[in-house]
Structure formats: C-alpha cells, structure tokens
From Swiss-Prot:
Active-site feature positions: C85
Origin: domain of life: Eukaryota
Matching PROSITE patterns: UBC_1 (PS00183), UBC_2 (PS50127)
Organism in which the protein naturally occurs: Rattus norvegicus
Positions of the UBC core domain: 1-147
Full protein name: Ubiquitin-conjugating enzyme E2 D2B
This protein's pathway: Protein modification; protein ubiquitination
Function recorded in the entry: Catalyzes the covalent attachment of ubiquitin to other proteins. Mediates the selective degradation of short-lived and abnormal proteins. Functions in the E6/E6-AP-induced ubiquitination of p53/TP53. Mediates ubiquitination of PEX5 and SQSTM1 and autoubiquitination of STUB1 and TRAF6. Involved in the signal-induced conjugation and subsequent degradation of NFKBIA, FBXW2-mediated GCM1 ubiquitination and degradation, MDM2-dependent degradation of p53/TP53 and the activation of MAVS in the mitochondria by RIGI in response to viral infection Plays a role in early maturation of the testis.
C-alpha cells in the first residue's frame, strides 16, 4: 500500500511540482527522499536553498512522513536537529495530505512562523519582540548555510 502511494505521489510531483519545491527518492530507496525548498521571496530566507529529508513509514499514508531540515535554518519552529514543529506532521496528519502539500506548508511556515507553538522559544521571543533582529539573523543564517 505505502509503496504504491509513494510512487503515485512521485508521479504527481513530476507532473505538477509545487512552487519553489522539489522532492524525490535518494537512490533506489523509495521510502527515503530528499527535498529542496527555495527560500520564499519576501522572507528573510529569500535566495536560500534548503534541503530536507523525508522518511516514509511503512504505514504511510496512515502515519505521517518524518520530515527534517538538513540545512541549518534560523526559525522558531525548526530546531538545531532540523525537526519541524508543524501540526500536519503530528496530530493533524491526514491520509488525504500529500508530500506536495507538506512541502507547501513548510514553505508557508518560512513566510509565517508560528511563534505560539515554537520548538525554539528563544527565537520565538525575538520574532515577537524584535522583528528586525529576527529578520537580520535569519538572513545571515541563510547566507551562511543555504547559499
């Protein structure tokens, strides 16, 4: 079941790729993918290329994929291990969701962080109280790690 669904999503991604995103298997292993999200325009991540790993469980799509950044990023919802705090990757997962929708959700999280559900409270606090400092630091990290 999982493999059939993963193949279908790969075909769908090839035919209708999400804006500024790409993803596909690493080598022959269909359960292990690499994805790329380009830093959205009008965000401090603009111009950066952010790499992520996607690991599908054997119960996919009934269990969510494990998606993590491998590129360092300064963001209140992404910790230093690359873990992402996003409801659809946890409690709000639905088998109707696809990798395309997940990547678009992560991309929109880059534009609109959720400081009220942070993985990194210190960054969330800076985002809430000193947006200029947040944007400056996020841009510096993007230039240092994603370009």
């Amino acid at each position: 079941m999982a493999l059939k669904r993963i193949h279908k999503e790969l075909n769908d991604l090839a035919q209708d790729p999400p804006a500024q995103c790409s993803a596909g298997p690493v080598g022959e292993d269909m359960f292990h993918w690499q994805a790329t999200i380009m830093g959205p325009n009008d965000s401090p991540y603009q111009g950066g290329a952010f790499f992520l790993t996607i690991d599908f469980p054997t119960e996919y799509p009934f269990k969510p994929p494990k998606v993590e950044f491998t590129t360092r990023i300064y963001h209140p919802n992404v910790n230093s291990n690359g873990s992402i705090c996003l409801d659809i990757l946890r409690s709000q997962w639905s088998p109707a969701l696809t990798i395309s929708k997940v990547l678009l959700s992560i991309s929109s999280l880059l534009c609109d962080p959720n400081p009220d559900d942070p993985l990194v409270p210190e960054i969330a606090q800076i985002y809430k109280t000193d947006r200029d400092k947040y944007n400056r630091t996020a841009r510096e990290w993007t230039q240092k790690y994603a370009m």
